[in-house]
């Protein structure tokens, strides 16, 4: 459970801290995923697509670091 301490009645700062913690813990992603049921086949396809995206991004970064691109 995420807890935030409000100091000096500064609610805006507490909200920013809450959003940052929720983002870091992946709660926004989980809430979005749980809004609708996802069939196992769709889940596998999405995960494969994400893996391909990550691999391409990593390859792009490696190529840029090595000076190929």
UniProtKB/Swiss-Prot annotation:
Keywords, ordered alphabetically: Ribonucleoprotein, Ribosomal protein
InterPro entries membership: Ribosomal_bS21 (IPR001911), Ribosomal_bS21_CS (IPR018278), Ribosomal_bS21_sf (IPR038380)
Recorded GO CC terms: ribonucleoprotein complex; ribosome
Pfam families according to UniProt: Ribosomal_S21
Molecular function GO terms recorded: structural constituent of ribosome
GO BP annotations, alphabetical order: translation
Highest rank taxon of the organism: Bacteria
Family affiliation: Belongs to the bacterial ribosomal protein bS21 family.
PANTHER family assigned to the protein according to its UniProt record, in alphabetical order: MITOCHONDRIAL 28S RIBOSOMAL PROTEIN S21 (PTHR21109), SMALL RIBOSOMAL SUBUNIT PROTEIN BS21M (PTHR21109:SF0)
Name of protein: Small ribosomal subunit protein bS21
Organism, scientific name: Hyphomonas neptunium (strain ATCC 15444)
Gene: rpsU
